[in-house]
Amino acid sequence: MNPQLRQISELDRVIHEPGRLIIVALLSAVEECDFLYLQHETELNKGTLSSHLARLEEASYVEIEKTYRGKVPRTLLRLTPAGRAAFEEYRQKMKAVL
Protein backbone atom coordinates (compact mmCIF):
# COMPACT_ATOMS: atom_id res chain seq x y z
CA MET A 1 0.00 0.00 0.00
CA ASN A 2 1.14 3.52 -0.77
CA PRO A 3 2.65 5.00 2.44
CA GLN A 4 0.52 8.14 2.12
CA LEU A 5 -2.66 6.09 1.80
CA ARG A 6 -1.61 3.94 4.74
CA GLN A 7 -1.60 7.12 6.83
CA ILE A 8 -5.34 7.47 6.14
CA SER A 9 -6.02 4.06 7.65
CA GLU A 10 -3.94 5.05 10.69
CA LEU A 11 -5.90 8.24 11.43
CA ASP A 12 -7.22 8.52 14.97
CA ARG A 13 -10.85 7.36 14.67
CA VAL A 14 -11.87 9.26 17.79
CA ILE A 15 -10.79 12.59 16.30
CA HIS A 16 -11.61 11.79 12.67
CA GLU A 17 -15.40 11.79 13.20
CA PRO A 18 -16.55 15.20 11.85
CA GLY A 19 -18.33 16.42 14.99
CA ARG A 20 -15.43 15.50 17.24
CA LEU A 21 -12.93 16.96 14.79
CA ILE A 22 -14.71 20.33 14.98
CA ILE A 23 -14.75 20.15 18.79
CA VAL A 24 -11.06 19.28 19.04
CA ALA A 25 -10.09 21.94 16.50
CA LEU A 26 -12.00 24.60 18.45
CA LEU A 27 -10.58 23.48 21.79
CA SER A 28 -7.05 23.46 20.36
CA ALA A 29 -7.34 27.20 19.74
CA VAL A 30 -8.25 28.10 23.34
CA GLU A 31 -7.05 27.22 26.81
CA GLU A 32 -10.60 26.37 27.90
CA CYS A 33 -14.19 27.25 27.08
CA ASP A 34 -17.63 26.55 28.44
CA PHE A 35 -20.22 24.15 27.08
CA LEU A 36 -22.55 26.89 25.82
CA TYR A 37 -19.79 28.58 23.82
CA LEU A 38 -18.80 25.25 22.27
CA GLN A 39 -22.43 24.43 21.51
CA HIS A 40 -22.88 27.81 19.82
CA GLU A 41 -19.69 27.49 17.76
CA THR A 42 -20.27 23.89 16.66
CA GLU A 43 -24.03 24.27 16.14
CA LEU A 44 -24.48 20.81 17.67
CA ASN A 45 -27.47 20.13 19.91
CA LYS A 46 -26.85 19.47 23.62
CA GLY A 47 -27.27 15.71 23.34
CA THR A 48 -24.94 15.30 20.37
CA LEU A 49 -22.32 17.60 21.87
CA SER A 50 -22.50 15.77 25.21
CA SER A 51 -22.12 12.42 23.47
CA HIS A 52 -19.06 13.58 21.52
CA LEU A 53 -17.51 15.11 24.64
CA ALA A 54 -18.08 11.88 26.58
CA ARG A 55 -16.23 9.94 23.86
CA LEU A 56 -13.37 12.44 23.87
CA GLU A 57 -13.21 12.32 27.67
CA GLU A 58 -13.17 8.50 27.55
CA ALA A 59 -10.14 8.72 25.23
CA SER A 60 -8.51 11.16 27.72
CA TYR A 61 -8.47 13.90 25.08
CA VAL A 62 -10.81 16.30 26.89
CA GLU A 63 -11.14 17.31 30.51
CA ILE A 64 -14.63 18.27 31.69
CA GLU A 65 -14.99 20.36 34.83
CA LYS A 66 -18.40 21.12 36.35
CA THR A 67 -18.47 24.34 38.38
CA TYR A 68 -20.90 27.00 39.52
CA ARG A 69 -20.89 30.73 38.88
CA GLY A 70 -23.02 31.82 41.79
CA LYS A 71 -25.99 29.45 41.55
CA VAL A 72 -25.63 28.86 37.83
CA PRO A 73 -24.00 25.58 36.78
CA ARG A 74 -21.16 25.86 34.29
CA THR A 75 -19.29 23.18 32.37
CA LEU A 76 -15.71 24.02 31.44
CA LEU A 77 -13.92 22.09 28.73
CA ARG A 78 -10.26 21.86 27.79
CA LEU A 79 -8.00 19.62 25.75
CA THR A 80 -5.64 17.50 27.80
CA PRO A 81 -1.96 17.30 26.82
CA ALA A 82 -2.78 13.90 25.29
CA GLY A 83 -5.63 15.50 23.32
CA ARG A 84 -3.37 18.25 22.01
CA ALA A 85 -0.73 15.70 21.01
CA ALA A 86 -3.30 13.47 19.30
CA PHE A 87 -4.72 16.43 17.37
CA GLU A 88 -1.25 17.53 16.26
CA GLU A 89 -0.47 13.98 15.10
CA TYR A 90 -3.80 13.89 13.24
CA ARG A 91 -2.97 17.21 11.54
CA GLN A 92 0.47 15.97 10.49
CA LYS A 93 -0.96 12.77 8.99
CA MET A 94 -3.60 14.75 7.09
CA LYS A 95 -0.92 17.10 5.74
CA ALA A 96 1.11 14.10 4.53
CA VAL A 97 -1.90 12.68 2.70
CA LEU A 98 -3.00 15.96 1.16
Language-model region placement:
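Residues within the DNA-recognition helix of helix-turn-helix
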Residues: 52
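Amphipathic alpha-helical dimerization/coiled-coil segments
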Residues: 1-8, 25-26, 84-98
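Accessory beta->alpha helical hairpin/"wing" motif in late/C-terminal subdomains of nucleic-acid enzymes
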Residues: 79-83
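N-terminal helix-turn-helix DNA-binding core of bacterial DNA-binding proteins
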Residues: 6-48, 69-71, 76-78
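Short beta-strand "wing" residues that participate in macromolecule-binding interfaces
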Residues: 64
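Glycine-centered, phosphate/nucleic-acid-interacting loop/turn motifs that mediate DNA/RNA or nucleotide
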Residues: 60
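Alpha-helical DNA-recognition elements
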Residues: 55
